[in-house]
């Protein structure tokens, strides 16, 4: 608990969206740990709107929070960057989670999954399973984390002419945005046998769209996150080829740990990379399918 003479630490938190269990889980872990530390959390949801997120940061500055934890709606958004610069001037510490922010603002630390490696792992698994592939990429172009995954994938297949990217669609990493995009690709007659989705939400949207078409050919679908939904598909069906597990729990824990170091005036790193792991039908039995890792 908080000693009477200690100032309660105030933490402003804004994730790009709460319409994703990854952020809900990360936040639940952060709440649990910071409650134990006696801190006060202000959590806001910008709903993928950069203007809204920038206003939320301005609100945190007015509230005189000690720390801002941000997962940016858009990594190079001028309005978000300008609000963060105001926060820095006010002496507020800034922790960026899950997707880095552009270099224009000096943040205190960035805590992200090894997103590039996630793309590499998927490409390697696909090449092991398939002698050739026509690939549909599902993207979220504003999110650096998502584009790093796509880049890792592209770089890994680059020198292999039998693996071709035939189309790239913007999905915002949301299931409901993905379904019409993939349906459109199928309606156009695009011939693909692999879907590389930036996250599990997009992978599930792709699966729904493909199932609705009742295709007789096999399309291999990959996601990234290791969400309970996808792990359940991996454990019980052959609909999904694989995902790369991130750990929102570990990420939330690391954020809380760094906040504690900041409060104690101890040193901490400017970047923490959280390792990622390929999950497929061969190793799904080693994972819990009910929750996150």
Model-based region annotation:
Residues 10-29, 33, 42-55, 59, ...:
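Extracytoplasmic "Venus flytrap"
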Residues 12-13, 65-74, 93-97, 136-137, ...:
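Periplasmic-binding protein-like
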Residues 156-157, 247-293:
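Hinge/cleft segment of the Venus flytrap/periplasmic-binding protein
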Residues 73-87, 153, 172-231:
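Hydrophobic alpha-helical
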Residues 22-37, 118-122, 145-163, 177, ...:
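Short, solvent-exposed amphipathic alpha-helices that sit
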Residues 11, 53, 110-134, 147-148, ...:
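Hydrophobic alpha-helical segments within soluble ligand-binding/sensing domains
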Residues 43-45, 102-125, 137-140, 236-249:
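Short beta-strand elements at the ligand-binding edges of bilobed clamshell
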Residues 77, 81-117, 134, 227-236, ...:
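Flexible loop/hinge segments that line or gate small-molecule binding clefts
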